[in-house]
């Protein structure tokens, strides 16, 4: 079985297909072209996911599920991006839209949390129970793993660093 991971960023949408050994077997990218309606961006995410699957020499029938890492405050239970400044999303129903477009089970998480979990499962933090990951892209984010689980805080903004004041009025 194969899995698709999508990195939804303020500049680019990147998709990767991995196998059960966490090996990336296909990729595809496109520009995000913000600001645009959530429906248009989801259509592009679905297209890029299908392109990555095709580039891997596979079909969507071989894909078990799709995981999306998105900037900002993400509610993984409701599968909604509550707020993402660089996408201009406010309570965007990304999970529901992507499920309709792809027919696959959708998982969604803050991008930095997803990166932190990926590092804990298959990357630099593999074998640890606690780790911190800082992401730098269109924005700045952070993900924390405590006891092998993602820490996201009570409001899903757990370790988001993008709005940390360094210089007052700066």
Residue ranges and their predicted role:
Residues 34, 38-46, 50, 62-66, ...:
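Glycine-rich phosphate-binding loop and adjoining helix at the ATP-binding site
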Residues 11, 71-74, 137-139:
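Short glycine-rich anion-binding loops that position phosphate/pyrophosphate groups of nucleotides
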Residues 22, 83-87, 150:
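Glycine-rich, phosphate-binding/catalytic loops in enzymes
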Residues 11, 112-113, 157:
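A generic "binding-loop/recognition-motif" signal
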Residues 4-8, 12-70:
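Conserved phosphate-binding loops in N-terminal lobes of ATP-dependent enzymes
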Residues 2, 16-18, 26-29, 37-40, ...:
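Glycine/GP-enriched mid-protein hinge/lid loop-to-helix segment characteristic of carbohydrate kinases
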